[in-house]
Swiss-Prot record:
The record marks M37 as: Within the serine palmitoyltransferase (SPT) complex, defines the length of the acyl chain-binding pocket, determining the acyl-CoA substrate preference. Residues 1-21, 67-80 are cytoplasmic. It comes from Xenopus laevis. GO terms for biological process: ceramide biosynthetic process. The chain crosses the membrane at residues 22-38, 44-66. Pathway: Lipid metabolism; sphingolipid metabolism. Residues 39-43 are lumenal. It is found in: Endoplasmic reticulum membrane. It comes from the Eukaryota. Coiled coil: none annotated. Belongs to the SPTSS family. SPTSSA subfamily. This is Serine palmitoyltransferase small subunit A-A. The lineage of its organism: Eukaryota, Metazoa, Chordata, Craniata, Vertebrata. It is a multi-pass membrane protein. Component of the serine palmitoyltransferase multisubunit enzyme (SPT) that catalyzes the initial and rate-limiting step in sphingolipid biosynthesis by condensing L-serine and activated acyl-CoA (most commonly palmitoyl-CoA) to form long-chain bases. The SPT complex is composed of SPTLC1, SPTLC2 or SPTLC3 and SPTSSA or SPTSSB. Within this complex, the heterodimer consisting of SPTLC1 and SPTLC2/SPTLC3 forms the catalytic core. Within the SPT complex, SPTSSA stimulates the catalytic activity and plays a role in substrate specificity, which depends upon the overall complex composition.
Length: 80
Protein backbone atom coordinates (compact mmCIF):
# COMPACT_ATOMS: atom_id res chain seq x y z
CA UNK A 1 0.00 0.00 0.00
CA UNK A 2 2.85 2.37 0.77
CA UNK A 3 4.34 1.90 -2.69
CA UNK A 4 0.97 2.70 -4.27
CA UNK A 5 0.66 5.93 -2.28
CA UNK A 6 4.17 6.99 -3.20
CA UNK A 7 3.50 6.29 -6.88
CA UNK A 8 0.28 8.33 -6.88
CA UNK A 9 1.67 11.25 -4.89
CA UNK A 10 5.13 11.20 -6.39
CA UNK A 11 6.41 14.31 -8.10
CA UNK A 12 6.59 12.65 -11.51
CA UNK A 13 3.00 11.41 -11.77
CA UNK A 14 0.36 13.73 -13.18
CA UNK A 15 -1.86 13.22 -10.13
CA UNK A 16 1.04 14.12 -7.85
CA UNK A 17 1.78 17.26 -9.83
CA UNK A 18 -1.90 18.24 -9.77
CA UNK A 19 -2.01 17.65 -6.01
CA UNK A 20 1.14 19.74 -5.52
CA UNK A 21 -0.29 22.55 -7.63
CA UNK A 22 -3.60 22.53 -5.71
CA UNK A 23 -1.67 22.55 -2.43
CA UNK A 24 0.36 25.52 -3.63
CA UNK A 25 -2.81 27.39 -4.71
CA UNK A 26 -4.44 26.71 -1.33
CA UNK A 27 -1.31 27.95 0.43
CA UNK A 28 -1.41 31.14 -1.67
CA UNK A 29 -5.10 31.58 -0.76
CA UNK A 30 -4.22 31.28 2.92
CA UNK A 31 -1.43 33.83 2.60
CA UNK A 32 -3.35 36.39 0.53
CA UNK A 33 -6.41 36.32 2.77
CA UNK A 34 -4.32 36.06 5.97
CA UNK A 35 -6.29 32.97 6.99
CA UNK A 36 -3.12 31.24 8.13
CA UNK A 37 -3.30 33.30 11.34
CA UNK A 38 -6.76 32.03 12.28
CA UNK A 39 -7.59 28.96 14.26
CA UNK A 40 -9.07 26.03 12.30
CA UNK A 41 -12.64 26.66 13.49
CA UNK A 42 -12.39 30.35 12.54
CA UNK A 43 -11.03 29.40 9.13
CA UNK A 44 -13.95 27.01 8.65
CA UNK A 45 -16.48 29.71 9.56
CA UNK A 46 -14.85 32.19 7.17
CA UNK A 47 -14.69 29.69 4.30
CA UNK A 48 -18.31 28.64 4.88
CA UNK A 49 -19.47 32.25 4.73
CA UNK A 50 -17.38 32.90 1.63
CA UNK A 51 -18.74 29.85 -0.19
CA UNK A 52 -22.33 30.71 0.72
CA UNK A 53 -21.99 34.34 -0.43
CA UNK A 54 -20.33 33.37 -3.71
CA UNK A 55 -22.95 30.65 -4.24
CA UNK A 56 -25.81 33.09 -3.67
CA UNK A 57 -24.23 35.63 -6.03
CA UNK A 58 -23.82 33.03 -8.78
CA UNK A 59 -27.38 31.77 -8.32
CA UNK A 60 -28.80 35.30 -8.38
CA UNK A 61 -26.82 36.12 -11.51
CA UNK A 62 -27.99 32.93 -13.20
CA UNK A 63 -31.65 33.62 -12.38
CA UNK A 64 -31.92 37.38 -12.93
CA UNK A 65 -29.27 38.36 -15.49
CA UNK A 66 -31.11 36.94 -18.55
CA UNK A 67 -34.18 39.03 -17.69
CA UNK A 68 -32.13 42.20 -17.30
CA UNK A 69 -30.18 41.59 -20.50
CA UNK A 70 -33.40 41.00 -22.43
CA UNK A 71 -34.91 44.20 -20.97
CA UNK A 72 -31.83 46.17 -22.04
CA UNK A 73 -32.00 44.72 -25.55
CA UNK A 74 -35.69 45.66 -25.79
CA UNK A 75 -34.97 49.16 -24.50
CA UNK A 76 -32.34 49.81 -27.17
CA UNK A 77 -34.60 48.14 -29.76
CA UNK A 78 -32.00 45.55 -30.66
CA UNK A 79 -34.59 42.82 -30.13
CA UNK A 80 -38.23 43.40 -30.99
Amino acid sequence: MKVLCEDVNGPRSSLGRAWSHMSWLYYQYLLVTALYMLEPWERTVFNSMLVSIVGMALYTGYIFMPQHILAILHYFEIVQ
